[in-house]
């Protein structure tokens, strides 16, 4: 028997249809093409014929009842062609030619031919089916004709993901029944025998009608009858199959099953459209949620970084001076710890923040979303401004620390100098008041008086010589006050005491002179030799005291030149020692001569010079002290010279490394700039090259670490300048940070270009052409085009943006797309986005609104219940939380405005 049932492989009925397939969804191929000769005399399989009669009759009646009629016997009731024409009018919605009402055979044949002609006009080639067979009641041909009508008007338009007809209907069934246990739809015969697939289809769309979990696979008749009864009662799908026939047939008739299943498809077609709309909305919402997650990450990272900057700047701007150098050195150590430990992670966070921001903006542009505008105060520019403020505060803080350390060092030096001079002066003034108050002249002889007068003159000479020391003490105290020395109170007290004592000495000296001069008239004797001794011994004694002060004086130098200057001065001082020694011997010779004269004249001396307290023993003692201090001074100067030579070595060592690292960083910066402009090869090649370049930069880090170690030694040695190099550690650090940031940003730009290329389908040749056009107008090779450069580029590409009103408006529109932040510059990434957008379709707000309208059943609003039914739970709640209440005249309680929500997704309104 000829198997015309194989025709279900395509939209035709005939023995050769199995080879045509369902791949031509829009094809009106030969529905009845022959594979072998059609044997009209062969009979249908009785079981299949029975199933087809029942199914096709029910299917026809489901449509004929709309016209108020039905058929009882499918091969008898269509013989006159009247109900056949009526059926075609109902299912097509079109008017057929007026039928002939005669009862003769010719009238019937003409009516059937009108029906067959109408079928053929729909692109269906009827093979081997003629009006005579239908009029004669040929069951095989009548069933074949009805199957052809079912294929054309009920199954042909079924399309699921580029498939159609049988394959589309089968794929639809597989998807709908996939979640159900014991259901595996692979065909339209035995996959449906247990009835579970029918129940699964109903439960998938109307779960309240079927208690699927209570169905048993081993009770197919119950399952089938349950599905048929529910479909007829609640879905208005007539019972087209008989449960016992399906169960008792080894292989149920495919056409009968497909006809019945197609009724389910059409009954649930609205739900199918809703599912498609829901999938589109889910896709759009998934993109939006991912972008919102990236925005939240950016906001948090930006907030944390800005908070750290906000907390750090006050610490760097705290310039409260400390009292001691130890406290300031601790502050300097804390600052170095901040530079080494706390700041580097924040530099990486800042770089990562810029990368995340650029990636987010690229994704937003690719998904046709508005550019991301961070919260107020959290723009990349705000972070850069805060970072710049931080680095300015950091630089000022370091300079302040070093200046404070220098100030405290000078204060310590001045304080020690003040104490030395004050101690020497106090030692000199000790007993002077008592001496000036002594009234020894009242009982002295004339010679004694003259001696007292000479002694007093010598004292006045000595007093005048000490005037410079007192002024130096006062000047040092004043400088300590001006430099805010922490122990200024004690210094001022001691200085005031010295000044008060000095004034008292001046007053007492004046009083004693008056007393001596008053008595002088009565006294004549004077020992000129002692007087000469006193006059020469006092200056010499002062010279030795000054020399001892200078030899014990502390010194602070920072360069070899300064220490060599001190050594030169010391050598010059040593060259004066022979003359000083001769002066000492001359003074001692005067003393010896006085003794010789006294002895020769039998003069009994008191043992001391009446005119001075400076004895030869004092002169010799101080001279010996000077002789001892000279080699000590030599040793101290040589030690300092060695220290400065070591410091010079550190300077040269640092300069040698810095003069290599600094130009290397500058060269790498220039090379990166050149690479970012030239960009030879594919984007993947460029990305690989840049990452290799980045690794070479990272591998260079040990050279920077070595320089940091050398810089640490310089700082520990308190070396504040270096004439051998123009590069400071701060310059090197800033250059290194800029180098890392630049290579990371360049890599990110290439990655974004790859992302844009893949998302938009841009070829490598197009990308290179875009780069060539961009570089041609990027005259300064800055990586961005100004408005005039960009306009010239657009004109070269054929855009009408001339300087007339219409061209200016078009140019302003394009600028708003490529420069949403109004920075006045168009980056290469923005240029690529614009060019790709001109040739690529993207989803729009109108598409999303249309999808929501499908879910809402063509209403202007949607309810939370409808959203929860059609969308996944998280995305349904996302929409409910953000949709505004619908305010239209047709609003119902709980109505939501999906139109404003959809436009807000694309930046056309506010959420």
Curated annotation (Swiss-Prot):
UniProt repeat feature Spectrin, residue ranges: 293-403, 413-518, 528-639, 649-752
Region Interaction with VCL, residue ranges: 12-26, 40-61, 108-126
UniProt subcellular location: Nucleus; Cytoplasm; Cell junction; Cytoplasm, Cytoskeleton, Stress fiber
Entry comment describing in which tissues the protein is expressed: Widely expressed.
Primary location class: nucleus
Record-listed Phosphotyrosine modification sites: 31
GO molecular function: actin binding; actin filament binding; calcium ion binding; chromatin DNA binding; integrin binding; nuclear receptor binding; nuclear retinoic acid receptor binding; nucleoside binding
Disease with which this protein is associated in UniProt: Focal segmental glomerulosclerosis 1: A renal pathology defined by the presence of segmental sclerosis in glomeruli and resulting in proteinuria, reduced glomerular filtration rate and progressive decline in renal function. Renal insufficiency often progresses to end-stage renal disease, a highly morbid state requiring either dialysis therapy or kidney transplantation.
This protein's name: Alpha-actinin-4
Gene: ACTN4
């Amino acid at each position: 028997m000829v198997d015309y049932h194989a025709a279900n492989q395509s939209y035709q009925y005939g023995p050769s249809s199995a080879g045509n397939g369902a791949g031509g969804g829009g094809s009106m191929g030969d529905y009845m093409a022959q594979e072998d000769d059609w044997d009209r005399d062969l009979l249908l399989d009785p079981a299949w014929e029975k199933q087809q009669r029942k199914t096709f009759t029910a299917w026809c009646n489901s449509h004929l009842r709309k016209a108020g009629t039905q058929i009882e016997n499918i091969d008898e009731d269509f013989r006159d062609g009247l109900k056949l024409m009526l059926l075609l009018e109902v299912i097509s919605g079109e008017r057929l030619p007026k039928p002939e009402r005669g009862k003769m055979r010719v009238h019937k044949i003409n009516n059937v031919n009108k029906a067959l002609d109408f079928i053929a006009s729909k692109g269906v080639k009827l093979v081997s089916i003629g009006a005579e067979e239908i009029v004669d009641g040929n069951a095989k041909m009548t069933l074949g004709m009805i199957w052809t009508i079912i294929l054309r008007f009920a199954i042909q338009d079924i399309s699921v993901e580029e498939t159609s007809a049988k394959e589309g209907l089968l794929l639809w069934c597989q998807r709908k029944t996939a979640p159900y246990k014991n259901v595996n739809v692979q065909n339209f015969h035995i996959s449906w025998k247990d009835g579970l697939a029918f129940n699964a289809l109903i439960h998938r769309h109307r779960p309240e009608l079927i208690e699927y979990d209570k169905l048993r696979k081993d009770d197919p008749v119950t399952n089938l009858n349950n599905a048929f009864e529910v479909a007829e009662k609640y879905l208005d799908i007539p019972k087209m199959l008989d449960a016992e026939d399906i169960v008792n047939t080894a292989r149920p008739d495919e056409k009968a099953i497909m006809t019945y299943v197609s009724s389910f498809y059409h009954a649930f077609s609205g739900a199918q459209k809703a599912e498609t709309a829901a999938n589109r909305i889910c896709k759009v919402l998934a993109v939006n949620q991912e972008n919102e997650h990236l925005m939240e990450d950016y906001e948090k990272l930006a907030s944390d970084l800005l908070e750290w900057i906000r907390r750090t700047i006050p610490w760097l701007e705290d310039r409260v001076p400390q009292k001691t150098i130890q406290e300031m050195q601790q502050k300097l150590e804390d600052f170095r710890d901040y530079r080494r430990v706390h700041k580097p992670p924040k530099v990486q966070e800042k770089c990562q923040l810029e990368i995340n921001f650029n990636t987010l903006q690229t994704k937003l542009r690719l998904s046709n979303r508005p550019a991301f505008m961070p919260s107020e105060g959290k723009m990349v520019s705000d972070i850069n401004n805060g970072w710049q403020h931080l680095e300015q505060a950091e630089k000022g803080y370091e300079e302040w620390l070093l200046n404070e350390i220098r100030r405290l060092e000078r204060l310590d030096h001045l304080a020690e100098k003040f104490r030395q001079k004050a101690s020497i002066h106090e030692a000199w003034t000790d007993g002077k008041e008592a001496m000036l108050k002594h009234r020894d002249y009242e009982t002295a002889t004339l010679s004694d008086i003259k001696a007292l007068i000479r002694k007093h003159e010598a004292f006045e000479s000595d007093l005048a010589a000490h005037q410079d020391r007192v002024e130096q003490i006062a000047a040092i105290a004043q400088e300590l006050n001006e430099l805010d020395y922490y122990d200024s109170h004690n210094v001022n007290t001691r200085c005031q005491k010295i000044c008060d004592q000095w004034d008292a000495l001046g007053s007492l000296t004046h009083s004693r002179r008056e007393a001596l001069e008053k008595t002088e008239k009565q006294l004549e004797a004077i020992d000129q030799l002692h007087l000469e001794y006193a006059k020469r011994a006092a200056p010499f004694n002062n010279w030795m005291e000054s020399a001892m002060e200078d030899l014990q004086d502390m010194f602070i130098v920072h360069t070899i030149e300064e220490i060599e200057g001190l050594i030169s001065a010391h050598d010059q001082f040593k060259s004066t020692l022979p003359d000083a020694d001769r002066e000492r011997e001359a003074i001692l010779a005067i003393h010896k001569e006085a003794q010789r004269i006294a002895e020769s004249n039998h003069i009994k001396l008191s043992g001391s010079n009446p005119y001075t307290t400076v004895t030869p023993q004092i002169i010799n003692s101080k001279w010996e002290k000077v002789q001892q201090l000279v080699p000590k001074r030599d040793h101290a100067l040589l030690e300092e010279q060695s220290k400065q030579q070591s410091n010079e070595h550190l300077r040269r060592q640092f300069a040698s490394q810095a003069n290599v690292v600094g130009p290397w960083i500058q060269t790498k910066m220039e090379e990166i700039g050149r690479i970012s402009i030239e960009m030879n090869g594919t984007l993947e090649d460029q990305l690989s090259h840049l990452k290799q370049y980045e690794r070479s930069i990272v591998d260079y880090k040990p050279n920077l670490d070595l320089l940091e170690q050398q810089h640490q030694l310089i700082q520990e040695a308190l070396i504040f300048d270096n004439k051998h190099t123009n590069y400071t550690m701060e310059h090197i650090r800033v250059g290194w940070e800029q180098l890392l940031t630049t290579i990371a940003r360049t890599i990110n730009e290439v990655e974004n270009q790859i992302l844009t290329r893949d998302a938009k389908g841009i070829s490598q040749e197009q990308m290179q052409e875009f780069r060539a056009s961009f570089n041609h107008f990027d005259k300064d090779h800055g990586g961005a085009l100004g408005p005039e450069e960009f306009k010239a580029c657009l004109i070269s590409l054929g855009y009408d943006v001339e300087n007339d009103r219409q061209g200016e408006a078009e140019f302003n529109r394009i600028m708003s797309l490529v420069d949403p932040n109004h920075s006045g510059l168009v980056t290469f990434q923005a240029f690529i986005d614009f060019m790709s957008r001109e040739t690529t379709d993207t989803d729009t707000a109108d598409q999303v609104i249309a999808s929501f309208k499908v879910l809402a059943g063509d209403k202007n609003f949607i309810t939370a219940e409808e959203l929860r039914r059609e969308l996944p739970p998280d995305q349904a709640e996302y929409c409910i939380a953000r949709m505004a209440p619908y305010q239209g005249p047709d609003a119902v309680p709980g109505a939501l405005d999906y139109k404003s929500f959809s436009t807000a997704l694309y930046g056309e309104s506010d959420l």
